[in-house]
Curated annotation (Swiss-Prot):
Family listed: Belongs to the heat shock protein 70 family.
Its biological purpose: Acts as a chaperone.
Organism, as annotated: Thermoanaerobacter sp. (strain X514)
PANTHER family: HEAT SHOCK PROTEIN 70KDA (PTHR19375)
Pfam families for this protein: HSP70
HAMAP family: DnaK (MF_00332)
Record keyword Manganese present: no
Modified residue annotations for Phosphothreonine: 174
Protein name per the record: Chaperone protein DnaK
Region (Disordered) location: 578-612
Ranges of compositional bias, category Polar residues: 586-598
Amino acid sequence: MGKVIGIDLGTTFSCVAVMEGGQPVVIPNAEGARTTPSVVAFTKEGERLVGQVAKRQAIVNPDRTIMSIKRHMGSDYKVKIDDKEYTPQEISAMILQKLKADAEAYLGEKVTQAVITVPAYFNDSQRQATKDAGRIAGLEVLRIINEPTAAALAYGLDKEGNQKIMVYDLGGGTFDVSILEIGEGVFEVLATSGNNHLGGDDFDQRIIDWLADNFKKEHGIDLRNDRMALQRLKDAAERAKIELSSATVTNINLPFITADATGPKHIDVNLTRAKFEELISDLVESTVGPVNQALNDAGLKPSDIDKVLLIGGSTRVPLVQETVKKIMGKEPHKGINPDEAVAIGAAIQAAVLSGEVKDILLLDVTPLSLGIETLGGVFTKIIERNTTIPTRKSQIFTTAADNQTSVEIHVLQGERPMAKDNKTLGRFILSGIPPAPRGVPQIEVTFDIDANGIVHVSAKDLGTGKSQDITITSTTNLSEEEIQRMINEAKQYEEQDRKKKEEIEIRNKADSLIYQAEKTMKDLGDKMTQAEKDEINKEIENVRKALEGSDIEAIKSASEKLSQAFYKVSTRIYQQAGGQTGGATNTDSAGQGTTQDNVYEANYKVEDDDNK
């Protein structure tokens, strides 16, 4: 069995890790960084860019750059580039492909299996979408695990004794809080809560709005209507937020942000940490509710918690740290890297599943209650939130009308009392029920949640034994045909990426060959005949012309001819130098031989002079 990698597929950054020699190791990407921006872009020429290279060109190519796609996982959102629409699963798969390729380059072997993390508060559709993204990227997703749980694994791998810990995970786009009990290799989640639409992106948006509103007041222009200006604001907001984690004031300087009839306009303002905290105070305060909810569900008080772990880049914001300290009455633990802990935990779980690590048991929970719609549009829960998974529960229902021969099972996930206020996971029909007065038929509905948190539902008429089983595939999930099509397209992109890399290598080799040829010609000087120099110069020119075009075979062919021409000259000079016997008859050879002899004589004479 090959290596199983652990992937933290984040909203703004992603990270990949693997177990090596019993220790989890973060895998650096091709650019040498330990995290990769979760950004995908398409150039006007149709080339696909992923990661840092995509993020760098966002300002000049905002319409074709996709960021924070994770916020749309499990929805029917689509990204339109030219005439093609991409689902969140496809864009996420492109990021996963990049992480997979970086892992393969690091490990020196093919990678086909992974554990991928998701926010604890992700619903079934979002989890299924993440699994589909893995498949499209060419990965068998062995397990989907919750990000806070993964972070707890990273923290608790080498810890002894029993501890109750709280993981406060505030990333780029999602917020989770989980309470766990760890000890003797068992990691048991007691409760989880969160908000799938709260994170660092929202902090950035507050700065963007503050800048744009002030600019509009002063100049009457709304920069949010200009895609390129808006992208510059986004970049500046993110930089300012990061700087204010360590500084108390930062300067935002954006020259030539736009122009009107009176000339170019600029932004040059200072943002203090106090003002930034005022802008985001309600967002940070909104994390308090889920923290209290998780504590209540776990039946614990803040004083019962031994350690508080801060995970996700947004927990570097001082106001966030102060808020957590205020709620919990203790300093948060800062002994783990908030950007890497989740990927490290995923790598540990990957090693557990592959048998590389033993004596670790992970007991996670379902974040939201599951049930069905019953008479009057009521949501009837079958599995309560924070139930340990995997789990299976059944409940018996009956018909609502006389002689009803079929029932529609409307499967939902959420906490609200009315069905319409919860998330629909899917619908299916159990038919063939014998006509009978209402209340007589006995229909058993069974919910099964696997270790990935993915739901399977079945309904059975106990009178006839007739049953209907489904794995939830809501309207936002992909069909098998769509997944296969996307897998094939992903392979094409992979092939394009491979060809692009090969093209760059061939071009670099050709450039290097020209440099070496010109340098060697200069070094050899008169040892080369004029005819040889002319031939080499001609071949150099041919390589240069080929490099101006896009025909890779032409570049390879021209490079090969230049190499052969040089090999011919080098061989002649080498043989001539080695086989020289003084009385050569060929004038060119004799001339070359004399030069060669003179060089050696000069060297010896210098040494003799030094000795005198």
